[in-house]
UniProtKB/Swiss-Prot annotation:
Heterooctamer of four alpha and four beta subunits. Pfam families: Asp_decarbox. The modification Pyruvic acid (Ser) is found at S25. The active site is at S25, Y58. Keywords: Autocatalytic cleavage, Cytoplasm, Decarboxylase, Lyase, Pantothenate biosynthesis, Pyruvate, Schiff base, Zymogen. Belongs to the PanD family. GO terms for cellular component: cytosol. Catalyzes the pyruvoyl-dependent decarboxylation of aspartate to produce beta-alanine. It is an enzyme of class 4 (lyase). This is Aspartate 1-decarboxylase. Its EC number is 4.1.1.11. Pathway: Cofactor biosynthesis; (R)-pantothenate biosynthesis; beta-alanine from L-aspartate: step 1/1. Is synthesized initially as an inactive proenzyme, which is activated by self-cleavage at a specific serine bond to produce a beta-subunit with a hydroxyl group at its C-terminus and an alpha-subunit with a pyruvoyl group at its N-terminus.
Length: 131
């Protein structure tokens, strides 16, 4: 039996742009995509910490090293520059794969620069990035 598991996330990223006129998707700095193991055109959940909204779209490559997180298309109504978001992906795994699987968690600062990458989530305020 296949089950759906949390695969990766870019945690507490800052939305840099919102482009209502673009066809759709979320543009993500290519450095962040690579760090999280998120592929271009992969389904991505966007959980807006600032506004409490949630949606699903797909990732496209943004300029490497730019820190860009641009919410495109209709999703721009739900996300604005300066909002803090979590970008997450999921994967379907067979039981044998899932036993040893560990998700990737990428923590970023307010400029969307990577400050940590690991596979362990620690709840609570001690883990939060405030830089």
């Amino acid at each position: 039996m296949r089950r759906t598991f949390f695969k990766a996330k870019i945690h507490r990223a800052t939305v840099t742009h919102a482009d209502l006129e673009y066809e759709g998707s979320v543009s993500i700095d290519e450095d962040l995509l690579e760090a999280a193991g998120i592929w271009e055109y992969e389904a991505v959940h966007i959980w807006n910490i600032t506004r409490g909204t949630r949606l699903q779209t797909y990732a496209i490559k943004g300029e490497r090293g730019s820190g860009i997180i641009c919410i495109n298309g209709a999703a721009a109504h739900l996300n604005r520059p300066g909002d803090m978001v979590i970008l997450a992906t999921f994967a379907e795994l067979e039981e044998a794969e899932a036993r040893d699987f560990k998700p990737t968690v990428v923590l970023v600062d307010r400029q969307n620069k990577i400050v940590a990458k690991d596979a362990v989530e620690v709840p609570g305020p001690a883990r939060r990035v405030t830089a």
